[in-house]
Amino acid sequence: QPLEFHKDLTYPNIGPRDSYLLYHEELESLVKNFPTIKRARFWMTFGQEYLTHLRVIQNIGMASIEPINYNGMEIVPLQFLKAVLPNPQDLGENYEGETSIGCRIRGIKDGKEHTYYVYNNCSHQAAYQETGMQGVSYTTGVPAMIGAMMFLKGLWKRPGVWNVEEFDPDPFMEALNKYGLPWHEVFDGDLEL
């Protein structure tokens, strides 16, 4: 069942949050390109109020993509819902708190088990002041811009189709620091895995 698996995970400067195990397409290419990975998971947080809204939308049929007849017109419930709900771009001013995106890694190095955590927190308010958008949009747009810049500078350019993890990560990580998404590292900490 969707959102069936969840547990509390602690996020830096945020604290514990109920985190849900989800599918994310990035996991497919990561395990393909790093075949020694034994387990890769994607966790995301949702507030209970948000989840309640999602359940209600699903239960009353508004998440459907199947057309229905309404007053002699064919409409798609999900498209109708999108038309009547506020534009997410208009909500950024009221967002508070931070996003937290990271990788929690456990493995063997030099015969010993180690953990490594690399993460970034992004303030919704700071992102809004800079761009007029909230932190989720910021943490989506800045890495995409950096990837395009890596390509245009020839740092990430070779014949064929490649995933980002197949390129040198160092210039990308340096650019994250430069363009507003500084990252932090924790070595051999408790990762709640």
Positions of PLM-derived features:
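C-terminal catalytic/substrate-binding lobe primarily of soluble NAD(P)-dependent oxidoreductases
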Residues: 1-193
